[in-house]
Amino acid sequence: LQEIWNVLSLGGPTAIPLMIASIFSLAVIIEKTIFFAKNKQDNKNLIRKVEMMIDEGDTMSAYNQLKGKKGPNVKLLSTALSNLDEDSERIREALQVTGQNEIRKMEKHLTILDVIAMIAPLLGLLGTVLGIISSFNILGGAAGIGDPTQISAGIASALISTAIGLIIAIPTAIFYSYFSKIVDRRAHQLNQSIVEIMDVVDGNDRGEKYEENVKNIS
């Protein structure tokens, strides 16, 4: 810790904002890694099984299959089952709202990574400029000759500040890109699931058996 503090102290006035940015970045990276690990894609066999039950009109069995299960597609199917007494357009709207809510959960806090990846190099550059200004002020002192030690410290501060900014920005940008691709891929899969579910729902007349089962569910 002492060595880290020594490096930060050499980084000049922008070192502390950069340190705070690095803490936020690390926290978001850990949070999103855990989130995506816990919320993997749903069991395809379960989804197909439930879709077949809906297709056959056995909504009670489909509802029971989903109890205690988690995942974006499970929530979509639960939404469809809860709205089977509505017309197709209302079911589609309900599915789209559920899908959008799931996407928002996946996107949560990603903006923080985007901002940090953008501002960290700028903060590093600001530290570089301030360090160089400090060095020139010393060099142009009253005697005309500055203290070499102080000049070196100013240059070191400038270089360290730039390095810290890049060290923070590069991995942050990489993780932001990685998480964004996961969100895009899963959003596409959710849209496909909505289409598949609507195909199943529209393929049935949803007659008396559906109405009876929906009443039992509610």
Features from the language model and the residues they span:
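Membrane-interfacial helix-loop-helix connectors in multipass membrane proteins
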Residues: L139-S152
